[in-house]
């Protein structure tokens, strides 16, 4: 099998790639794709070493709707639990000649390492706190649908920046298109090392002033060691209607899910464009699978 292109990080994409994927995703949303079974007779293996509802279901539905044969391996009963090395497992699966492997793993950077041992297309469905490129592509599509362009938009990413792969991928992608990016987080959850970020804030109301887009992040308790008060977090960093009034009147509020209601966001604004993100995520993953098979 010829070596095909991977999607491991946002840096794998050019502006042209993003625009082409976005165009394809819009065609899938509008049901205007001429050959919707572009993956007929292709084999897609889903390997999710972390729990997932949205991303796993989205990739599985996307691949099946494009005509692929999809195998989602039950990790808890796989050879990994018998002590097999992850690299050996990937090499074994690669020997079966799949066309794609879609992998989620708790270890940052691991998928870049695994890519050296496969000759199929490899897609990163989230690796630790490193990257989640298809989520960023879906978020880009949502923002474009509301704001038409990214350049000079004030986009505020708020919450658990330190542990967030969604934040990292969005920062890198949105900056490619000229966004002005601000981060809001408690000091213990802030990450100060992004050259692409324009400003850091420790106050939510200060950070979202005149924001065009507010992107909230889940508080990732599974990656944290302390037990900070959820009530205190919501008081300081949870978004409600009163705090939202500091943003622009037409600001959109996003969240990659799953939502912790009453922690990151109040019930009265929790249903903003979040389900649209899910819908656009499915179209985006169809577009990515379609695009990678042709490059």
UniProtKB/Swiss-Prot annotation:
Q: PANTHER family of this UniProt entry?
A: ASPARTATE CARBAMOYLTRANSFERASE, ORNITHINE CARBAMOYLTRANSFERASE, MITOCHONDRIAL
Keywords noted in UniProt: Pyrimidine biosynthesis, Transferase
Its domain of life? Bacteria
Name the pathway it acts in: Pyrimidine metabolism; UMP biosynthesis via de novo pathway; (S)-dihydroorotate from bicarbonate: step 2/3
- Fill in the subunit field for this protein: Heterododecamer (2C3:3R2) of six catalytic PyrB chains organized as two trimers (C3), and six regulatory PyrI chains organized as three dimers (R2).
Protein name, per record: Aspartate carbamoyltransferase catalytic subunit
Q: Which PROSITE patterns match?
A: CARBAMOYLTRANSFERASE (PS00097)
**Any GO BP annotation:** 'de novo' UMP biosynthetic process
Organism encoding this protein: Wolbachia pipientis subsp. Culex pipiens (strain wPip)
Q: Which InterPro entries match?
A: Asp/Orn_carbamoyltranf_P-bd, Asp/Orn_carbamoylTrfase, Asp/Orn_carbamoylTrfase_sf, Asp_carbamoyltransf, Asp_carbamoyltransf_Asp/Orn-bd
GO function terms (MF aspect): amino acid binding; aspartate carbamoyltransferase activity
Query: What is the stated purpose of this protein?
Result: Catalyzes the condensation of carbamoyl phosphate and aspartate to form carbamoyl aspartate and inorganic phosphate, the committed step in the de novo pyrimidine nucleotide biosynthesis pathway.
Ligand binding (L-aspartate): 82, 165, 218
């Amino acid at each position: 099998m010829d070596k095909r292109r991977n999607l491991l990080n946002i840096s794998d994409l050019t502006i042209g790639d993003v625009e082409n994927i976005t165009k394809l995703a819009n065609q899938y949303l509008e049901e205007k794709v001429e050959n919707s079974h572009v993956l007929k007779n292709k084999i897609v293996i889903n390997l999710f070493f972390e729990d997932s509802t949205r991303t796993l279901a989205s990739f599985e539905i996307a691949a099946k709707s494009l005509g692929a044969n999809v195998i989602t391996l039950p990790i808890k009963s796989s050879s990994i639990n018998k002590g097999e090395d992850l690299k050996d497992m990937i090499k074994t699966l690669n020997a079966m000649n799949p066309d794609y492997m879609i992998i989620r793993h708790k270890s940052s950077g691991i998928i870049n390492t695994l890519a050296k041992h496969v000759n199929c297309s490899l897609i990163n469905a989230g690796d630790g706190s490193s990257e989640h490129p298809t989520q960023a592509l879906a978020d880009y599509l949502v923002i474009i649908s509301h704001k038409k362009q990214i350049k000079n938009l004030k986009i505020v990413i708020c919450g658990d920046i330190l542990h967030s792969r969604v934040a990292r991928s969005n920062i890198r992608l949105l900056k490619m298109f000229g966004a002005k990016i601000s981060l809001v987080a408690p000091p213990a959850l802030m990450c100060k090392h992004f050259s692409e970020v324009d400003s850091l804030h420790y106050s939510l109301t200060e950070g979202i002033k005149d924001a065009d887009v507010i992107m909230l992040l889940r508080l990732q308790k599974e990656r944290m060691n302390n037990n900070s008060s959820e009530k205190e977090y919501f008081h300081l960093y949870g978004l409600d209607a009163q705090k939202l009034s500091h943003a622009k009147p037409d600001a959109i509020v996003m969240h990659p899910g799953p939502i912790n209601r009453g922690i990151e966001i109040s019930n009265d604004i929790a249903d903003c464009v979040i389900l649209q993100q899910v819908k656009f995520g499915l179209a985006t993953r169809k577009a990515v699978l379609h695009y990678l098979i042709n490059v």
